[in-house]
Amino acid sequence: MIKVVFMGTPDFSVPVLRRLIEDGYEVVGVVTQPDRPVGRKKVLTPTPVKVEAEKHGIPVLQPLKIREKDEYEKVLALEPDLIVTAAFGQIVPNEILEAPKYGCINVHASLLPELRGGAPIHYAIMEGKEKTGITIMYMVEKLDAGDILTQVEVEIEERETTGSLFDKLSEAGAHLLSKTVPLLIQGKLEPIKQNEEEVTFAYNIKREQEKIDWTKTGEEVYNHIRGLNPWPVAYTTLAGQVVKVWWGEKVPVTEPAEAGTIVAIEEDGFVVATSNETGVKITELQPSGKKRMSCSQFLRGTKPEIGTKLGENA
């Protein structure tokens, strides 16, 4: 039986681990990030992958730094024939990459060489792409730069969010892995080098990227809101207060107005001007210190005026 070590951390990784178990491989160990404090009470919380591994009685390693010798030697001691990673969250050292008979392969949520990095799902939507996908490739020390083994395309729908696309790609990754591993073991795959001229990056989202830039086009603002839903969530400011914007709709704006200005207030939301003739009607938001709510609920208690400028004093 093929001995596999799985390395992964978030919810995205769980269906991949589950599929390895269902397909009958001997998962001899799981490597995941350490437990982290979560929420206002800072409750020490295990990763989703750790929770899944423990359900199946699989030994779990949680190195703070996998590149340290005493940590990677624990992985090598498991003597895996194959290592599979999916959103592990640390750069894996060569000592591990070179050890397994069938190598180390990674399940990545983009059509490489596009969108290398830790936030490919967010960026696929934020950049307005109509499709993305899953790539399974050999791992190298350089970020997401290994030779491609298999790929599958996944359509991005008009109202797709990072949350819904995350779920689709997670399942697509598990399914593609199920088809890829037997072909890899049988030596039936021809690795394809990535075209370095086509490389783009999707680095982890920083706080300053979450703010809505109303000077962009309506389409770009709409994609920005979708791409940061349900985490970390786009935000703007209204009357000097931070407001998270959970959802908006593209609407035509016929009269010229300064970008970021409220140009219409309707029953279900208010329309904000952008840099072109497509405005964004905010329909779901979350004022600072309050719960997420529909804009119609918000407007019952707060009455912004037409001409109010959003995005100032953030």
Curated annotation (Swiss-Prot):
SUPFAM superfamilies: FMT C-terminal domain-like, Formyltransferase. PROSITE patterns: GART. Signal peptide: none annotated. Its EC number is 2.1.2.9. (6S)-5,6,7,8-tetrahydrofolate binds at residues 110-113. It catalyses: L-methionyl-tRNA(fMet) + (6R)-10-formyltetrahydrofolate = N-formyl-L-methionyl-tRNA(fMet) + (6S)-5,6,7,8-tetrahydrofolate + H(+). InterPro entries: Fmt, Formyl_trans_C, Formyl_trans_C_sf, Formyl_transf_N, Formyl_transf_N_sf, Formyl_transferase-like_C_sf, GART_AS, Met-tRNA-FMT_C. Gene3D superfamilies: Formyl transferase, C-terminal domain, Formyl transferase, N-terminal domain. It comes from the Bacteria. GO terms for cellular component: cytosol. Keywords: Protein biosynthesis, Transferase. One of its GO terms (molecular function) is methionyl-tRNA formyltransferase activity. Belongs to the Fmt family. Attaches a formyl group to the free amino group of methionyl-tRNA(fMet). The formyl group appears to play a dual role in the initiator identity of N-formylmethionyl-tRNA by promoting its recognition by IF2 and preventing the misappropriation of this tRNA by the elongation apparatus. NCBIfam families: fmt (TIGR00460). This is Methionyl-tRNA formyltransferase. The gene is fmt.
